[in-house]
Amino acid sequence: MNLPVNRHKLAFTAGIRLQSLLGLDTKYKMQGKIYPDLRLDLQWSLPVSNGWDVSFSGGLGWISRMPTTAQLYPDFKYVDLIQLNYYHTNPDYRRINMMTYKWDNTNYQLEPARNMKWEVRADVSYKGNRLSITYFRERMNNAFDDITYYRSLAYKLYDPASIDGSALTAPPELSQLTYTNEYNLDVYSTQGNVMKVCKEGVEFQFASKRIESLKTRVTMYGAWIKTIYNSDSPQYKASSILLDNKQLKYVGLYNGDNGTESQAFNTNFMFDTYIQRLGLTFSTS
């Protein structure tokens, strides 16, 4: 929608996109839901004066970042616990026995990561030279990251010392062996909406008028971006301490990441030269 005001011009644009994942099982929280993404843009163009063309614009929008296939349908979790590993000089008398656990590692509460972004931009053109600067901010309160959980898995630990190897005529029978009841305590992970991401930055671009003597235009563009990752989801961690060659059977619960900050700045230069006689344009950057 364009609205002229004297010699000024206002332009307003609005749009909406609807997203949904089809074919999900009813166990998924996303099943049957529609996620709307709204976008609003406003531009104010000033009157052209003495070769100066100036405009200001701003935008606000939301976007839903859908989980990937690997996040929606992770592999089943398998854990093998060795109960007996008996070695005999006669290969026919050797035996290994394991307890295997299998479970579904899917997080059915997973939802799209919702990103909100706003930006303001200034564009200035003068006699074939153009400069644009954009400042933006983004925020996601439910970005994807690992969530941890622990499980205690019971198994029998058979004592190889209770086997009389000289009397064997076949692999040892488990029912005739002594054992102790043990359990394995460990930490596992799956995907969840537990990460908060805040991002802000400045993007810029300058394109010069083509220098007639060199038939060359200079373009410079780049950005500065700061990103902060924060997760208040507690994290489980298994003990790495061994006592009598056995893992210390404790699990610790720790606070989530209080904030990790990263910053990046990059600038690029590009020179494109037009050779009219050959009808060719060469670009270097």
Q: What name fits each language-model region?
A:
Residues 1-46, 115:
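Surface-exposed extracellular loop regions of Gram-negative outer-membrane beta-barrel proteins
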Residues 6-12, 158, 162-285:
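Gram-negative outer-membrane beta-barrel transporters
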Residues 2-9, 44-50, 64, 114, ...:
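Outer-membrane beta-barrel strand-turn architecture
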Residues 1-5, 40-44, 60, 110, ...:
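Residues on the lipid-exposed face of transmembrane beta-strands in outer-membrane beta-barrel proteins
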Residues 14-20, 42, 56-62, 71-73, ...:
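Transmembrane beta-barrel strands of outer-membrane/channel proteins
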Residues 24-31, 69-75, 82, 144-150, ...:
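Outer-membrane beta-barrel translocator domains and adjoining extracellular loop/strand segments
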Residues 64-140, 161-170, 183-209, 260-263:
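Outer-membrane beta-barrel signature, preferentially recognizing the C-terminal barrel domain
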Residues 1, 21-26, 41, 85-87, ...:
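Extracytoplasmic loops and strand-loop junctions of Gram-negative outer membrane beta-barrel proteins
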